[in-house]
């Protein structure tokens, strides 16, 4: 995490405090709701089923998210960082062509397309990563951009409820605006890992201990996307360089065109809005 000076601390403290206050209120409301339900049904459910949000791990995560936002290397109209990412095998034929260096022992293998069963898979903990990582390739984020076409980049992870909730809306954009823009999902570190800071309503995915774990989660997230709304999905490298460069932390949307940032989305989760990207693409489509 970047070094934090006093000025940055003073700038981000109000946001950190307001987010922690929101988490405290959320926990209080959840407790009262469970207590009321228990009194009405004369039964009690363990708090293990309702993890608290205001925890030491949660506050650290909120703090880190604001530090990343303050130190992001992008600005509207500025150059887009060409971060290192890991491409998965089995991209759809409608994806733009790109050049990547195949990883490890499978550099001469042809990626195997995902089967129907794999496409229907939900995000679960998996210890078998060989089949997923065998067709990965080291790439750069801007390898997926084409000249004069907007590239919509969607950063997020399956354990973050707002990201998953708006995934269908994002897939609608992929389907409806394929003629004017390209799309890319960058799978970053888990926002709410099940073994550290789980969120109610989030998919249960543990922390990524190795690149294979992240590639498995990214591959399974791609399986949740409908065929007509599917786009390339890549994984951030384990040094989280894309996450740091773009100041993501939880989820964020960008539009890149000709190497420049044309749309800079708000900080997730509260200002992560797919509808704003839709408005941007509608203006692009109308100008053609």
Curated annotation (Swiss-Prot):
What subcellular locations does the record give? Endoplasmic reticulum membrane
Whether Oxidoreductase counts among this entry's keywords is yes
Q: What turns on expression?
A: Treatment of larvae with thyroid hormone T3 causes a significant decrease in intestinal levels. The thyroid hormone synthesis inhibitor potassium perchlorate (KClO4) significantly increases intestinal levels. Thyroid hormone T4 causes a decrease in intestine at day 3 of treatment but levels return to normal by day 6. Expression is significantly reduced in liver in response to all three treatments.
Q: What is the lineage of its organism?
A: Eukaryota, Metazoa, Chordata, Craniata, Vertebrata
What's its top-level EC category? oxidoreductase
Question: What binding partners and quaternary form does the record give?
Answer: Predominantly monomer. Can form homodimers but homodimerization is not essential for enzyme activity.
Task: List keywords of the entry alphabetically.
Answer: Endoplasmic reticulum, Membrane, Oxidoreductase, Selenocysteine, Thyroid hormones biosynthesis, Transmembrane, Transmembrane helix
Q: In which tissues is it expressed?
A: Expressed in intestine, liver, kidney and brain of immediately premetamorphic larvae, of larvae in all stages of metamorphosis and of parasitic feeding juveniles. In immediately premetamorphic larvae, levels are significantly higher in intestine and liver than in kidney and brain.
Per the record, what ranges lie on the membrane's Cytoplasmic side? 27-288
What's the protein name? Type II iodothyronine deiodinase
The protein's job, in short, is: Plays a crucial role in the metabolism of thyroid hormones (TH) and has specific roles in TH activation and inactivation by deiodination. Catalyzes the deiodination of L-thyroxine (T4) to 3,5,3'-triiodothyronine (T3), 3,3',5'-triiodothyronine (rT3) to 3,3'-diiodothyronine (3,3'-T2) and 3',5'-diiodothyronine (3',5'-T2) to 3'-monoiodothyronine (3'-T1) via outer-ring deiodination (ORD). Catalyzes the phenolic ring deiodinations of 3,3',5'-triiodothyronamine and 3',5'- diiodothyronamine.
Identify its protein family. Belongs to the iodothyronine deiodinase family.
Gene3D superfamilies per the UniProt record, alphabetical: Glutaredoxin
Q: Where is this region: Disordered?
A: 99-130
């Amino acid at each position: 995490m970047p070094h934090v000076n006093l000025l940055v601390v003073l700038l981000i403290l109000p946001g950190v405090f307001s987010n922690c206050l929101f988490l405290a209120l959320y926990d209080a409301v959840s407790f009262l709701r469970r207590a009321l339900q228990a009194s009405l049904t004369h039964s009690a459910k363990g708090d293990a089923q309702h993890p608290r949000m205001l925890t030491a791990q949660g506050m650290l995560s909120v703090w880190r998210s604001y530090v990343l936002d303050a130190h992001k290397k992008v600005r509207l109209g500025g150059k887009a960082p060409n971060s290192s990412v890991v491409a998965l095998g089995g991209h759809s034929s409608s994806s733009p062509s790109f050049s990547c260096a195949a990883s490890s022992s499978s550099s001469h293998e042809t990626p195997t397309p995902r089967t129907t069963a794999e496409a229907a898979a939900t995000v679960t903990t998996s210890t078998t990563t060989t089949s997923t990582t065998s067709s990965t390739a080291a790439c750069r984020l801007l390898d997926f951009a084409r000249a004069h076409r907007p590239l919509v980049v969607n950063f997020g992870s399956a354990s973050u409820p707002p990201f998953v909730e708006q995934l269908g809306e994002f897939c609608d954009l992929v389907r409806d605006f394929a003629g004017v823009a390209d799309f890319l999902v960058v799978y970053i570190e888990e926002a709410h890992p099940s073994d550290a800071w789980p969120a109610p309503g989030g998919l249960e995915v543990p922390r990524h201990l190795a690149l294979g774990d992240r590639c498995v989660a990214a591959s399974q997230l791609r399986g949740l996307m409908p065929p007509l709304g599917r786009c390339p999905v890549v994984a951030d490298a384990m040094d989280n360089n894309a996450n740091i460069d773009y100041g993501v932390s939880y989820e964020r949307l960008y539009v890149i065109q000709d190497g420049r940032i044309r749309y800079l989305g708000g900080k997730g989760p509260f200002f992560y809005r797919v509808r704003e990207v839709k408005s941007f693409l509608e203006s692009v489509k109308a100008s053609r």
